[in-house]
Curated annotation (Swiss-Prot):
Top-rank taxon: Bacteria
Keyword Kinase listed: no
Leader peptide range in chain numbering: none
Single GO biological process annotation from the record: regulation of DNA-templated transcription
Annotated GO CC locations: cytosol
A molecular-function term among this protein's GO annotations: DNA binding
Organism of this sequence: Micrococcus luteus (strain ATCC 4698 / DSM 20030 / JCM 1464 / CCM 169 / CCUG 5858 / IAM 1056 / NBRC 3333 / NCIMB 9278 / NCTC 2665 / VKM Ac-2230) (Micrococcus lysodeikticus)
Keywords for the protein's UniProt record, in alphabetical order: Cytoplasm, DNA-binding, Transcription, Transcription regulation
Name of this protein: Probable transcriptional regulatory protein Mlut_12910
Stated family: Belongs to the TACO1 family.
InterPro entries: Integrase-like_N, TACO1_YebC-like_2nd/3rd_dom, TACO1_YebC_N, Transcrip_reg_TACO1-like, Transcrip_reg_TACO1-like_dom3, YebC-like
UniProt-annotated location(s): Cytoplasm
Amino acid sequence: MSGHSKWATTKHKKAVIDARRAKAFAKYIKNIEVAARAGGPDVAGNPALDLAVSKAKKASVPNDNIDRAVKRGAGLTGEVIDYAEIMYEVRGPQGSALLVECLTDNKNRAAADVRAAVTRNGGTMADSGSVSFLFERKGLVRLPAEGNTEDGLLEAVLEGGADAEEVVLSGDSFEILSDPSDLQSVAKALDEAGVEYESDELEFVPTMKVDLDASGARTFLRLTDALEDLDDVQNVFSNVDIAPEVLAELDED
């Protein structure tokens, strides 16, 4: 019986990983389609498309998928791709706040899906501006803490002629924060220094973080999981900090 249980658990974990991988691929594909629609299919003459394609390749999105997305976005397949960007503001448990970034071809569907996910999982929809003021738009490069140091990363960025506001240790990762306009120069400086990084994105970073207890963390994680599972949701940003001892308690559930 235990063997069957372990196999079922393994299958479930694989299904979760596969679903997240598919969702990540869909996110990159949408970004490619939007960039191709706005600036055409020529990567050399469309910097936004060049960046979107580069990120997709770094995430191991298959080349065939990338090529089809470029053609769809540029209108070369006869399909009409018209996405709208929408930001929803959400209040979570124990003073937590979330920004839900959507890229959708159906605003009504996106609004209904987000509202349902929020209300069913312990959150409440917030008025525009009532949550977003708690965040700042930043360039953010994530890389593993192992093998790197704060001083070494700052030196690599500065020697590459880029500007970084700060380097923050977050769990087992370093985060290099910059002005949004400096993000690509920071990433380029790291590339030139031979420093490998996991991601470089524009994100909404909280000006202050909120600590949650185990009960609040359970609700928060259920809420964010429900939102991130939605097809129209590209990103979920929050001001939450879950302490290691709280995470350890959740692991015992």
